[in-house]
Regions:
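N-terminal membrane-proximal hinge/A-helix region immediately C-terminal to the signal-anchor transmembrane segment
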Residues: 2-117, 130, 134, 156-161, ...
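Cytochrome P450 heme-thiolate "Cys pocket" and heme-binding signature region
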Residues: 322, 327, 407, 444-479, ...
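Cytochrome P450 catalytic-domain helical core, especially the substrate-recognition surface
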Residues: 35-64, 83, 110-201, 214-276, ...
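Central I-helix of cytochrome P450 enzymes
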Residues: 192, 253, 259-272, 298-358, ...
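Conserved cytochrome P450 K-helix/beta-meander segment immediately N-terminal to the heme-binding cysteine loop
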Residues: 419-447, 536-537
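Classical protein tyrosine phosphatase
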Residues: 30, 86-96, 103-105, 202-207, ...
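Cytochrome P450 heme-binding "Cys pocket" and the immediately downstream C-terminal segment
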Residues: 347-349, 468-516, 528
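Conserved cytochrome P450 K-helix E-x-x-R motif and the immediately C-terminal K′/meander segment
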Residues: 46-71, 265, 365-408
Length: 541
């Protein structure tokens, strides 16, 4: 019997060997990258990142350094058998994540984010599936460009409040004093939060705003620390999620235990509150009440193609409204704060914007959305802020669902694929002199303009952020109003030659913010101060 088994097994082993030999012999090479060590790969650099000053080097900078080292816009990293390919150019992201999006729209299963913290209700982390399609389609219906037009009165009202509160803060200061970072950020947080809470949940009180702002901030912390690929080893070894939190080295379990209740409350508490108001007939019309109305009428059930997913439409609505509040508030705050920080370093650019705004808008009213097409230099500033200092420097991780070949390099099925947004928006092939803040690059005729940063700053392909239209409208109006009414500058005594450092002057995470900074915000004229205090006419809101 043993000899019979041996005689049968030898041919089988030979067949397997020949199959594997032919497959790997003729397979193209993987993209260049750190060789690492046998079995564990590049785990050493993964757990011991370089430092810049007293900060860890962010992933986008490490990926960019690797691209320069290997002279390639595709980088392969192997950590414990987990293959990751990073895309560092416009060309590579356009080809793989846009044109071949059918192969690259999946997500890896992040044990930390989805299983331990509980972000699995967020369609941004869902795998490419019917469930994801249903959630995204539902979200898109509420935040597509045509839908966002209906929210403009809310945006105008909240922008009026932002200007009024800034005017009050400025009026209490001496002529040489500056606005403290925490005061400024509080006003900007209120601005962003009030818009999305009113649109999504019909909430308008300061108490509600403060409550949900704290909750969203802690939830954002969990996402920022956990979603970047490979932050926690449990993502490489999902079985680690079963070890008790008290085990030495299980810091990730203790962090997840802290974050999970907040993430659950983020999606459940506001929805349940609106449900109670809707049932009592006191709810303010909003996206949530629109969906509750559909549910009460028995409409908007899953289409036949989605029935196999057994989707409860209330859970879909609960989840998509939760995503809207969380994502929109953090992104908008980051973009507005970054714009203020950057403009404080560029008085010459502000002067050109002031001249354009005075010519188009005048000094008797605030700019509004109808002015946007007549303010090309302001638009150029807005684009250049997004390009130079992207809110999300590294895109969410995609996952290849089949073997692929690009530029002679092999990309295996199951590989994690990351678009390095910072590298893409500083690609010298697309943006001349990319390390210089220069709005004029977008002032040339359309045929000569570089790609709009909006194509890359909010993700790629079928996974691009569908809430970007509201975020961009909200941010544009805030920046337009600030430039129309104020001079923004660094505090007295600040080093006028100190330039913004893309690493040390920003936080690290999925969404980045400027490090704490103080700024002088001075009304340009007494008339401008009056405009800030009065805001938009009530008939516009």
């Amino acid at each position: 019997m043993p000899s019979t088994l041996l005689s049968l097994s030898i041919p089988a082993l030979l067949i397997i060997y020949v199959f594997l030999y032919r497959r790997f012999k003729h397979r193209p090479p993987l993209p260049p990258g750190p060789k690492g060590l046998p079995i564990i790969g590049d785990v050493i650099s993964a757990i011991s990142p370089k430092t810049v000053g007293d900060m860890d080097q962010p992933d986008w900078a490490r990926y960019l350094d690797l691209g320069k080292k290997y002279n390639s816009d595709l980088i392969h990293i192997n950590v414990l058998g987990d293959h990751t390919i990073v895309l560092n150019s416009v060309k590579a992201t356009d080809e793989l994540l846009e044109r071949r999006s059918a192969l690259y729209s999946d997500r890896p299963r992040f044990a930390m984010v989805n299983d331990l913290i509980g972000w699995d209700w967020n369609f941004g982390t869902m795998p490419y599936s019917n469930e994801w399609r249903l959630h995204r389609r539902t979200f898109h219906q509420d935040f597509q460009p045509s839908a966002v037009l209906a929210y403009r009165p809310v945006v105008l009202r909240s922008t009026s409040v932002l200007l009024e509160r800034l005017a009050a803060t400025i009026s209490d200061l001496s002529p040489t004093a500056h606005v403290e970072h925490n005061d400024l950020k509080y006003h900007v947080h209120n601005h962003a939060g009030s818009i999305i809470l009113r649109i999504v949940y019909g909430m308008t009180t300061q108490e509600e705003l403060d409550d949900y702002a704290k909750m969203a901030a802690l939830a954002a912390e969990s996402m920022n620390e956990s979603l970047n690929h490979g932050t926690f080893f449990v993502d490489y070894f999902p079985i680690l999620k079963y070890i008790p939190a008290w085990v030495p080295g299980a810091t990730f379990k203790r962090k997840a235990k802290t974050w999970a209740p907040t993430v659950a409350n983020l999606v459940n508490r506001p929805w349940e509150k609106v449900k109670r108001s809707f049932a009592s007939g006191t709810a303010i019309p909003c996206i949530a009440t629109k969906h509750l109305e559909k549910l009460s009428n028995g409409g908007d059930q899953p289409q036949s193609g989605d029935q196999d997913q057994h989707e409860d439409m209330e859970e879909v609505y609960r989840s998509t409204t939760g995503v809207a509040y969380f994502a929109a508030s953090d992104t908008t705050v980051s973009l507005v704060m970054t714009a203020i920080f950057v403009l404080s370093h560029h008085p010459e650019i502000q002067a050109k914007a002031h001249k354009e705004l005075d010519s188009v808008v005048g000094n008797s009213r605030l700019p509004d959305f109808s002015d946007r097409s007549d303010l090309p230099y302001l638009e150029a500033i807005f684009k250049e802020v997004q390009r130079m200092y992207p809110v999300s420097p590294v895109g969410n991780t995609h996952r290849a669902t089949a073997d692929d070949v690009y530029e002679g390099y092999f990309i295996p099925n199951g590989t994690s694929v990351i678009g390095n947004i910072w590298a893409v928006l500083h690609d010298p092939e697309a943006y001349r002199d990319p390390l210089k803040f220069n709005p004029d690059r977008f002032m040339v005729k359309d045929s000569e303009q570089p790609p709009s940063p909006e194509l890359y700053a909010f993700g790629f392909g079928r996974r691009i952020c569908p809430g970007k239209h509201l975020a961009l409208e909200t941010t544009w109006l805030a920046i337009a109003c600030l430039l129309a009414t104020c001079d923004i500058s660094r505090p007295h005594g600040a080093d006028s030659k100190k330039e913004i450092h893309p690493i040390t002057d920003f936080t690290i995470g999925l969404t980045v913010h400027p490090q704490p900074f103080n700024v002088r915000i001075i009304p340009r004229t007494p008339t401008a101060l009056k405009l800030m205090k009065n805001g938009y006419p009530s008939e516009d809101m």
